Amino acid sequence: MKLIIFTGLVLFGIVSLIEAQAENEKACLPQYQVCTDAPGNCCSNLVCDCYGRYKSGARIGRNCFCLQKGVIYKRED
């Protein structure tokens, strides 16, 4: 009986370790990819920058993209 419990605990530990490792190896989002629903998934040299969308002064949405850290984007007319 103790052997069965011990085996179960060992298997549970192995499965938990595999799941944690798979979680850490998730593919990151490359530059210019949308990160609205996953702000923490941009690659390490990128940051998830969000911008509000407005129409006639009213906010109609929000867009987020993986962009380079420290870079400022300006609108060109």
UniProtKB/Swiss-Prot annotation:
Contains 4 disulfide bonds. GO terms for cellular component: extracellular region. Expressed by the venom gland. It is found in: Secreted. It comes from the Eukaryota. Residues 1-20 form the signal peptide. Residues 21-26 form a propeptide. Disulfide bonds: none annotated. One of its GO terms (molecular function) is toxin activity. Keywords: Disulfide bond, Secreted, Signal, Toxin. InterPro entries: Spider_toxin_CSTX_knottin. The keyword Nucleotidyltransferase does not apply. Belongs to the neurotoxin 19 (CSTX) family. 08 (U8-Lctx) subfamily. This is U8-lycotoxin-Ls1v. It comes from Lycosa singoriensis (Wolf spider).
